[in-house]
Amino acid sequence: MSKKLTFQEIILTLQQFWNDQGCMLMQAYDNEKGAGTMSPYTFLRAIGPEPWNAAYVEPSRRPADGRYGENPNRLYQHHQFQVVMKPSPSNIQELYLKSLELLGINPLEHDIRFVEDNWENPSTGSAGLGWEVWLDGMEITQFTYFQQVGGLQTGPVTSEVTYGLERLASYIQEVDSVYDIEWAPGVKYGEIFTQPEYEHSKYSFEISDQVMLLENFEKFEREAKRALEEGLVHPAYDYVLKCSHTFNLLDARGAVSVTERAGYIARIRNLARVVAKTFVAERKKLGFPLLDEETRIKLLAEED
């Protein structure tokens, strides 16, 4: 590798590359979530027949992974660069390798392996065929072909490419700690995120009000159901995300037993499934507007 890109240059390079492949550049969704997959730009758009190509950075919060800003590789919040393409291009893996080249990583000079790792998200009733991408022994990306999202079978097939930006930047810049990553010229990752990491870890493990969180989960669940009764998919899904993050805070705090944990996950999954079904029904009412006219007319005629 020659020039060592800053963190923000890595993002800009990936944005430009996937824009050139026909992806819309979306912005991070403004609700807490544990992974870019949970953004409505992936979760909702991966289901139903309409095409969808999007790329975006998604800050992802995982309270149980917080380490008070002291661990060089474990974080309360990390950043994913998410690419979703539906239908999946036949050359998606080749496109991915080309994106690495633009980041200064020559596939001919490095050990890049696709290691089978089928993906599942029990909280959203989602699963797919997947591979971890290992670069010289370190996982940097998750590749997934969705088979099921929100309990619904997917079709056409959606491919998802999730870059772990901190790991990728650590490799490109040859640093051992994420806090030493250069975010922008003269500004280190740690200068931005060490204090938030410490504070969120302290809150998640020591300070959070368990009673309040338990009450909030119940309230968010009720509100999601109320929104769904009115056919309001997006507000309902916002509350599903709030339920998920609240559960993650409870889990980090040790406030739920193993048995209770399974119950909470099932409750979130049930909500997500209703959201998914309602979304597809609403898109059908609209006539699946993102489909080309010929396919749209044919599909609607078949379904009628």
Swiss-Prot record:
GO terms for biological process: glycyl-tRNA aminoacylation. InterPro entries: aa-tRNA-synth_II/BPL/LPL, Gly-tRNA-synth_heterodimer, Gly-tRNA_ligase_asu. Belongs to the class-II aminoacyl-tRNA synthetase family. Its main location: cytoplasm. Tetramer of two alpha and two beta subunits. Keywords: Aminoacyl-tRNA synthetase, ATP-binding, Cytoplasm, Ligase, Nucleotide-binding, Protein biosynthesis. It is found in: Cytoplasm. GO terms for cellular component: cytosol. It comes from the Bacteria. One of its GO terms (molecular function) is ATP binding. It is an enzyme of class 6 (ligase). It catalyses: tRNA(Gly) + glycine + ATP = glycyl-tRNA(Gly) + AMP + diphosphate. The keyword ATP-binding applies. Its EC number is 6.1.1.14. HAMAP family: Gly_tRNA_synth_alpha. Pfam families: tRNA-synt_2e. This is Glycine--tRNA ligase alpha subunit. The keyword Transit peptide does not apply.
